[in-house]
Amino acid sequence: MPSVLAGRYRLERLLGAGGMGAVYRAKDLLREQFADPEPYIALKVLSEAFAQVPDASALLYSEFALTRHLRHDNVLRMYSFEVDTECQRAFITMELMQGMTLDQLLCERPLGLPWRELRTIALPLLDALAYAHARGVLHGDVKPSNVMLGDDGLRLFDFGLGQAKEGTLPGLPHLSRDRINAWTPGYAAPELLEGKPLAASADVYGVVV
């Protein structure tokens, strides 16, 4: 994979990797050219293996569209969906946050968090989910590693297993997530593990377990 995607985004450091792809800290060279003091973004690109899966680019676009549909202070901001013509790899650009994920915080605090601190996480997270559900979007994979805690507050991210309710984003193709079967044991609602459809209750389950 080239070090610069679409002639604009220079990959600098791997931030994390999952089943669909990897997330990098990247520099937006166009923003740098125009003297933007903060030219850094997060960039998620499909892995070489997953890029060969049918509908892989469409699944990534679905994640982008679902997240972009939500304009909420506690949902990670999406910027663009693009395809690099050299390596034919789809990617999305998004807000880069400084901080740690909730699972990293919990690893540092094995005895748990006091309610005073926990409520500052749980309340904005539930508010983000309530907003998403009201806008017809289901997250599908609520877990600590998909919650970022930073100086600018909490952000829910990674709608890769998300879905739009009927009538929401009608132009978005209905794609099956069955083949990636990425529900997280311990956070996935029992009905998801039984193969039942995703519902808002499954997102709430991921918060309370």
Regions found by a protein language model. Name each.
Residues 102-113:
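AlphaC helix of the protein kinase catalytic domain
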Residues 121-122:
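Activation segment signature within eukaryotic-like protein kinase domains
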Residues 77-90:
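Short beta-strand micro-motifs within the conserved protein kinase catalytic domain, predominantly
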Residues 47-69:
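AlphaC helix of the eukaryotic protein kinase fold
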Residues 175-191:
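Conserved activation segment of eukaryotic-like protein kinases, specifically the C-terminal portion
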Residues 127-137:
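Protein kinase catalytic-loop region centered on the HRD/HxD motif
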Residues 161-163:
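Activation segment
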Residues 87-101:
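Conserved short submotifs of the Hanks-type protein kinase catalytic core
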